[in-house]
Swiss-Prot record:
Known partners and oligomeric status: Part of the 50S ribosomal subunit.
One Pfam family here: Ribosomal_L1
InterPro entries documented for this protein: Ribosom_uL1_bac-type, Ribosomal_uL1, Ribosomal_uL1-like, Ribosomal_uL1/biogenesis, Ribosomal_uL1_3-a/b-sand, Ribosomal_uL1_CS
Biological processes per GO annotation: regulation of translation; translation
Keyword annotations of the record: Repressor, Ribonucleoprotein, Ribosomal protein, RNA-binding, rRNA-binding, Translation regulation, tRNA-binding
Keyword Magnesium annotated: no
Family statement drawn from the similarity comment of this UniProt entry: Belongs to the universal ribosomal protein uL1 family.
Protein purpose: Binds directly to 23S rRNA. The L1 stalk is quite mobile in the ribosome, and is involved in E site tRNA release. Protein L1 is also a translational repressor protein, it controls the translation of the L11 operon by binding to its mRNA.
Single Gene Ontology MF annotation: structural constituent of ribosome
Alphabetized Gene3D superfamilies for the sequence: 3.30.190.20, 3.40.50.790
Origin species: Sinorhizobium fredii (strain NBRC 101917 / NGR234)
Protein's UniProt name: Large ribosomal subunit protein uL1
Presence of the UniProt keyword Kinase in the record: no
Length: 232
């Protein structure tokens, strides 16, 4: 514990918690302070001027990060027949129908993202209480209920990130690894921010992007000037 506390304290040296950094400087500082013995995830959090308790202020969507996420994503597909074969050929890790529903109902979830063909949704709907809280329920709004399972699987494997605003008006996501070069991280962060901006709901009033911050898994958070993200 003493070693961990010392490392955390050292990672905060040279960081001004009150300062608002430009994106390039913030990425450099975060990378320098990602000193854990594993490849830390770089995370972005955006505080939005919305109240998600109101339906017209919900923010959700999906973005394909140009440089991927750096993590291996296991994909499950609910499909039958030719579509099941298509999913397997595209690289899905788990494919099934009633059999897969039973497995998930039994508590075994060995995947990170879930896709379904439209005809499977009455069946998959039974899993709402299991998949919903984990943010895995297939949804046509984010492209996970689709007949084009090949594109959906490849997108999921290739860096697709879903986002959804939380109760406090915060939307966050992992946008890469500390091992990524700074340019790749900046491109991913800008792509994520752009997607969140484009998902601005009609009910949002006033300042939409209130605050932005980035951090590594074990490192300190740094505030970012939204203007350096091309965010208004």
């Amino acid at each position: 514990m003493a070693k961990i506390a010392k490392r955390v304290q050292k990672s905060r040296e040279g960081i001004d918690p009150a300062k608002v950094y430009g994106l390039t400087e913030a990425v450099t500082l975060v990378k320098e302070r990602a000193t854990a013995k594993f490849d830390e995830t770089i995370e972005v959090a955006m505080n939005l001027g919305v109240d998600p308790r109101h339906a017209d202020q919900m923010v959700r969507g999906v973005v394909n990060l140009p440089n991927g996420t750096g993590r291996s994503v296991r994909v499950a597909v609910f499909a039958r027949g030719a579509k099941a074969d298509e999913a397997k050929a595209a690289g899905a890790d788990v494919v099934g129908a009633e059999d897969l529903v039973e497995i998930v109902q039994g508590g075994k979830i060995d995947f990170d993202r879930c896709i379904a063909t439209p005809d499977m949704m009455p069946l998959v709907g039974r899993l709402g209480k299991v998949l919903g809280p984990r943010g895995m329920m297939p949804n046509p709004k984010v492209g996970t209920v689709t007949m084009d399972v090949t594109a959906a699987v490849k997108s999921s494997k290739g860096g697709a990130v879903e986002f959804r605003v939380e109760k406090a008006g915060i939307v966050h996501a992992g946008v890469g690894k500390a091992s990524f070069d700074a340019k790749a991280l900046e491109e991913n962060i800008r792509a994520f921010a752009d997607a969140v901006i484009k998902a601005k709901p009609t009910g949002a009033k006033g300042n939409y992007v209130k605050r932005v911050a980035i951090s590594s898994t074990m490192g300190p958070g740094l505030k970012i000037d939204p203007a350096t993200l091309s965010v208004a």
